[in-house]
């Protein structure tokens, strides 16, 4: 008997389910369109071809087109790293049009790393300079410097792309171009992590949870990347455990302290951002790295979110089980203190991450630390471990999903009618405020949307790096700095038929390496003898030809957890942003385990909320598992 028949017999398609689907379908539809808006807006803010940033050099990520009240027409190392990491993940999942943007960014950072600035030069602290002019020159005005999260985040972004290159056999590009740049940033992190600097909001000069968390991640994955390119990072290996040891000191017993050396309460979305940007899909609910589903991170989520409930008029009358608009920290006075789009989206994203982790491990645990978080959403919550097969688990997961979606719905409500996202929205009337078209806001939308759809990045190695010494030590280590000039990208990665010369100049002299490549196309497979890695996950794009009418939406459901375990309310929404009358294409890209076999179907949610299943039989698919094969496409037609 088909799954569709079973549904009919069990009576699952009822008014209650229709109401759930109605709310989800409305948000799904907006997110499908908004994701396209966000991707376009990000590219509009990247030089040299970005429509909104005339004058910015190639590959430079501009924070916002706003040049007055406030003037954000600069490039920040932190923001750029976070944005490019988002694009790298999209590229890994099949958005190959982003290739040149990522390459141009990496090339620009080779220049930026070598620019002398008020924080120093390449090997004397200059990598901690927070922002630069869009023409790749130093900004010399007064500013909160240094900011030590930037090099770590830039390293993470470049490692992500470097790993894609390695997974597809392009070892020379990863080794000769990406690794020397990453090595510089890892050297900075290892040398300066134990020194104070300004936090991500550029206001507190002290020690910041977000900074320390992303520094730990960068050194862990940096060491693994070094090994993958045939090198090593001893300074990564010696400092990562000490950084993790220090990270534990931010836990107060009930929430994560955002900054030492601050007179504030310490409740700050700095900590939510730290959790989501160190999320590892292979990790458990580990308190030591404050994984999104960990008791500490969930308790902190409640404390931070609740700190905004009473201070914004927008949040009046909302219960503890309802999402609210979220700002940076409750004492904020910038623009009179308002909710931020990226902060509100971070609150949602942490919960989507947690849902993914619970689903993967097949259970959730409630401890004394996290009990208040769960009780606010499910009054019957009690300490214990609940299997995914239990009714309590299902009820809690449903409540958390609804809570998470509530934050995204707030963003939908206050986004401009054309989808534009500024930095902030007014705490009283919800109107957009501060810098327009903030690049980070758009990146936050894309990452939250991906996590909502169970599209996750690769592991960064948390499971092998979650222990620390018995006694913390104030240490540092010296690495290797070298200037890098990228004259062009190899044809196997870029446009074909080019010659690449990467020149690396270190403190001990000059080492030049040249590579001539004759591969004809960026889509061809390298024929070199370089070893090739078999990916553990594959980005599978489902292309469906289906003629629809206005108000209808298409979802993908299937027999595995990534496709909702046949639950229609957990189906994956397809996008129609490429739909035309001559080519009615719906599509979605989902990251699935390599070698996984499963059954699936598409469903159509009508404008009246009714659900229509495809005709039988169930479709079947096995995810490829082969050397260098990290993407795949399935082409179907509605039946």
Curated annotation (Swiss-Prot):
Substrate binds at residue 143. PANTHER family: GLUCOAMYLASE, TREHALASE. GO terms for cellular component: fungal-type vacuole. The active site is at residues 199, 202. Residues 19-24 form a propeptide. Residues 497-529, 614-639 are annotated as: Disordered. GO terms for molecular function: glucan 1,4-alpha-glucosidase activity; starch binding. Residues 1-18 form the signal peptide. Residues 494-531 are annotated as: Raw-starch-adsorbable GP-I sequence. Pfam families: CBM_20 (PF00686), Glyco_hydro_15 (PF00723). GO terms for biological process: polysaccharide catabolic process. Its EC number is 3.2.1.3. It catalyses: Hydrolysis of terminal (1->4)-linked alpha-D-glucose residues successively from non-reducing ends of the chains with release of beta-D-glucose. It comes from Aspergillus kawachii (White koji mold). Coiled coil: none annotated. This is Glucoamylase I. Glycans are attached at residues 194, 418, 464, 466-467, 475-476, 482-483, 485, 487, 491, 495, 498-501, 503, 505, 507, 511-514, 516-517, 519, 521, 523-531, 533-534. Residues 532-639 form the CBM20 domain. InterPro entries: 6-hairpin_glycosidase_sf, 6hp_glycosidase-like_sf, Carb-bd-like_fold, CBM20, CBM20_glucoamylase, GH15-like, Glucoamylase, Glucoamylase_active_site. The keyword Glycoprotein applies. Belongs to the glycosyl hydrolase 15 family. The gene is gaI. Keywords: Carbohydrate metabolism, Cleavage on pair of basic residues, Disulfide bond, Glycoprotein, Glycosidase, Hydrolase, Polysaccharide degradation, Signal. The keyword tRNA processing does not apply. Residues 628-639 have a biased composition (Polar residues). Disulfide bonds join 233-236, 245-472, 285-293.
């Amino acid at each position: 008997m088909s799954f569709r028949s079973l549904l009919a017999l069990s009576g699952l398609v009822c008014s209650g389910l229709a109401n759930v689907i109605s709310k989800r379908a409305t948000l799904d539809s907006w997110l499908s369109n908004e994701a396209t808006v966000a991707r376009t807006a990000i590219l509009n803010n990247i030089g040299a071809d970005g429509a909104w940033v005339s004058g910015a050099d190639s590959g430079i990520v501009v924070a916002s087109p706003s040049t007055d009240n406030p003037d954000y027409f600069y490039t920040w190392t932190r923001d750029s790293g976070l944005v490019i990491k988002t694009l790298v993940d999209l590229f890994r999942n099949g958005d190959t049009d982003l290739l040149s943007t990522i390459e141009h960014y990496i090339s620009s950072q080779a220049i930026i790393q070598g620019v002398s600035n008020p924080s120093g030069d390449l090997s004397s602290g200059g990598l901690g300079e927070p922002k630069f002019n869009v023409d790749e020159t130093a900004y010399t005005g007064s500013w909160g410097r240094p900011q030590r999260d930037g090099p770590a985040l830039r390293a993470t972004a470049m490692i992500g792309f470097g790993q894609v290159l390695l997974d597809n056999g392009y070892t020379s590009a990863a080794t000769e171009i990406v690794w020397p740049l990453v090595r510089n940033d890892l050297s900075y992190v290892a040398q300066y992590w134990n020194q104070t600097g300004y936090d991500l909001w550029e206001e507190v000069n002290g020690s910041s949870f977000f900074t320390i968390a992303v520094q730990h991640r960068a050194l862990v994955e940096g060491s693994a990347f070094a090994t993958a390119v045939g090198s090593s990072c001893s300074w990564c290996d010696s400092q990562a455990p000490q950084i993790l040891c220090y990270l534990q000191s931010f836990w107060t017993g009930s929430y994560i302290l955002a900054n030492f050396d601050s007179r504030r309460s310490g409740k700050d979305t700095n900590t939510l951002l730290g959790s989501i940007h160190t999320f590892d899909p292979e990790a458990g609910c580990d308190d030591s790295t404050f994984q999104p589903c960990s008791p500490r991170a969930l308790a902190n989520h409640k404390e931070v979110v609740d700190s905004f409930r009473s201070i914004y008029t927008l949040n009046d009358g909302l219960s503890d089980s309802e999402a609210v608009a979220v700002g940076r920290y409750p004492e904020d006075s910038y623009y009179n203190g308002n909710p931020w789009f990226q902060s509100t989206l971070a609150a949602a994203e942490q919960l989507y991450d947690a849902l993914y982790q619970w689903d993967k491990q097949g259970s959730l645990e409630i401890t004394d630390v996290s009990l208040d978080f769960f009780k606010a959403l499910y009054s019957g919550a009690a300490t214990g471990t609940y299997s995914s097969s239990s009714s309590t688990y299902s009820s809690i997961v449903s409540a958390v999903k609804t809570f998470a979606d509530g934050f995204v719905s707030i963003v939908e409500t206050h986004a401009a009618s054309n989808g534009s996202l500024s930095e902030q929205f007014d705490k009283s009337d919800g109107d957009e405020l501060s810098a327009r078209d903030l690049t980070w806001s758009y990146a936050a939308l894309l990452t939250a949307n991906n996590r909502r759809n169970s599209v996750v990045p690769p592991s960064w190695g948390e499971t092998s790096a979650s222990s620390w010494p018995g006694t913390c030590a104030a240490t540092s280590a010296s690495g290797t700095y070298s200037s890098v000039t990228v004259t062009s990208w190899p044809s196997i990665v870029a446009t074909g038929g080019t010659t690449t010369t990467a020149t690396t100049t270190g403190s001990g002299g000059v080492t030049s390496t040249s590579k001539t490549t004759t591969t004809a196309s960026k889509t061809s497979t390298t024929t070199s003898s370089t070893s090739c890695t078999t990916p553990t996950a594959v980005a599978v794009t489902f292309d469906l030809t289906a003629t629809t009418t206005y108000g209808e939406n298409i979802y993908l459901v299937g027999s595995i957890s990534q496709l909702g375990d046949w639950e229609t309310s957990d189906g994956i929404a397809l996008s129609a942003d490429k739909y035309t009358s001559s080519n009615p294409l719906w599509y979605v890209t989902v990251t699935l385990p390599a070698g996984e076999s499963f059954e699936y179907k598409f469903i159509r949610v009508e404008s009246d909320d009714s659900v229509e299943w495809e005709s039988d039989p169930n479709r079947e698919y096995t995810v490829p598992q082969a050397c260098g094969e990290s993407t795949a496409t399935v082409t179907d037609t509605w039946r």
